[in-house]
Regions:
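Short loop/turn segments at secondary-structure transitions that flank enzyme active sites
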Residues: 65-67, 90-92, 111-113, 185, ...
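N-terminal "leader" segments that precede or initiate the main folded domain
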Residues: 1-7
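Short alpha-helical segments and helix-capping/turn motifs at coil-helix boundaries
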Residues: 30-32, 41-46, 66-71, 88-92, ...
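N-terminal accessory interaction module
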Residues: 44, 54-55, 60, 66-80, ...
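Compact, glycine/acidic-enriched structural inserts
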Residues: 80-82, 86-144
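Acidic, carboxylate-rich catalytic segments that either coordinate divalent cations
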Residues: 391-437
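N-terminal ordered "arm"
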Residues: 7-66, 79
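Hydrophobic, aromatic-lined core segments that form the binding pocket/scaffold
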Residues: 148-404, 417
Length: 437
């Protein structure tokens, strides 16, 4: 369990005295060094005092001393500056490529740390560290949530950067793709992104002033003007629907004009979705947003407050869709405007990461700070992750908090990365009395 031994060394979760080398010399750990997760020794620039002499250099850690030879460190000059070899089992004496014998010290993982770690790995409950959450200092919780919030934004920034590259350096196009993806609200997110990438913005831009043409362009590219891909209950009605026929005819003209090829309409998911989340409705809402010039990054950058962002993203549908969710099937009249919670989700998943990523790209710290300000201005999301943490004593107050908890679950809890988690650290270092009180 070498990884756990690394952890014990890094966080000094071991008795500080008495420590000795395998040949009986006293050891004092002054500084454990900087953890290296890449090639080379495990810890750089450590400081250890051996028999009263201070040594500054690298520390290498293994389960068994013989792993030194298994890993070829005796032939690698990068390990010549190792000032201490820390092992669980000292089964051999090791040598560097220069023939030197670095001091070696046996260090065991404390039983309580090992037991607590096994508890975390074996736990079926989420979060596995729930027993200590309510007793954690507020500073510990706040600092970790702040770090997780930034980590999540960094992760989303990478995804946006990939979209910018795929869009040949166009931030406006990347914003449209990001916005479209989040119009899928999870279930159809991947398909919305695929669809958005198929939209030649330069071409549809020629028809931006005509909302009917934009609808035809968007729905046609989505493959939804082919009645065969629509839910069975509306296929026959769609073919007889005048509006559907007009859209299909208009898209045929646009497809010839711009050599368009739609995506596979069978990819869209309608089953078990609420009608307001049907891709037909979401695409028409986005068409209106685009028609009104509110789907551009420049407009987002101009927003100075949460209220302005909400106004930018608020949208509805055209008259036909006020009485339809699917082609040919009438329903009770509704403007089908975004709910406040939907606008909040779009703000969290689109506006915030785009402002942060674009701010990084432009070297504009104000945009980056604005992204964090938006998260702090929004209430925490309501989902099962946030609710689970509330039940164990950690209540999310803002969207920044809820985003941090989502990051915590997906990047740490689900992957059992307890050794990289500050809550996991608190669990591991606690005594059994602390853990059970």
């Amino acid at each position: 369990m070498e990884e756990l031994l690394h952890y014990v060394w890094k966080h000094k979760l071991f008795p500080l005295a008495p420590l000795t080398t395998t040949d009986g010399k006293s050891v004092e750990v002054v500084d454990v060094g900087l953890h290296n997760r890449h090639a080379g020794p495990d810890f750089f620039n450590a400081k250890v005092r051996i028999d009263g002499t201070l040594w500054v250099g690298n520390v290498e850690i293994h389960d068994k001393a013989s792993d030194w030879f298994v890993h070829g460190h005796d032939r690698d000059a990068r390990y010549d500056n190792v000032v201490l070899h820390v092992v669980d089992i000292a089964d051999v004496v090791v040598r560097t490529s220069q023939g030197a014998t670095p001091p070696q010290m046996v260090l065991h993982v404390p039983d309580r740390v090992r037991d607590h770690y096994q508890e975390l790995l074996a736990a079926e409950d989420y979060p596995p560290c729930h027993a200590v959450i309510s007793s954690l200092p507020r500073l510990t919780v706040c600092s970790w949530l702040s770090a997780l919030q930034t980590e999540r934004l960094e992760q989303k920034t990478e995804a946006i950067s990939d979209r910018v590259k795929a869009c040949e350096g166009s931030w406006e196009a990347a914003y449209f793709v990001t916005l479209a993806r989040n119009f899928g609200f999870g279930v159809n997110g991947d398909i919305f992104e695929l669809w958005a990438r198929s939209i030649p913005l330069g071409s549809v831009g020629h028809h931006r002033d005509d909302l009917f043409q934009v609808e035809a362009f968007f729905l046609g590219q989505a493959g939804l003007l082919d009645s065969a891909v629509l839910p069975p209950r509306c296929r026959e009605a769609a073919d007889e629907d005048t509006y559907f026929q007009r859209l299909r005819s208009e898209y045929a003209y646009l497809a010839r004009k711009f050599s368009l090829r739609p995506i596979d309409g069978h990819l869209w998911r309608f089953l078990r979705l609420r009608p307001q989340n049907f891709p037909t409705i979401r695409i028409v809402q986005l068409a209106r947003l685009y028609h009104e010039g509110r789907a551009g990054l420049s407009r987002l950058v101009d927003c100075a407050s949460l209220h302005q962002v909400a106004e930018l993203l608020a949208t509805s549908v055209t008259p036909y869709w006020e009485t339809h969710y699917l082609f040919g099937l009438e329903s009770r009249r509704s403007e089908k405007r975004f709910s406040a919670s939907s606008i909040a989700l779009l703000t969290i998943n689109t506006a915030v990461p785009m402002l942060f990523a674009y701010g990084r790209h432009k070297g504009d710290e104000k945009l980056c700070y604005r992204a964090f300000d938006l998260l702090e201005a929004l209430s925490a999301e309501k989902n099962h992750i946030v609710e689970t943490w509330r039940k164990v004593g950690l209540k999310a107050q803002t969207a920044g908090d809820s985003q941090a908890l989502i990051q915590l679950k997906r990047a740490y809890c689900d992957r059992k990365e307890c050794l990289r988690c500050r809550f996991g650290y608190e669990y591991l270092k606690k005594t059994d009395h602390d853990k059970n009180r």
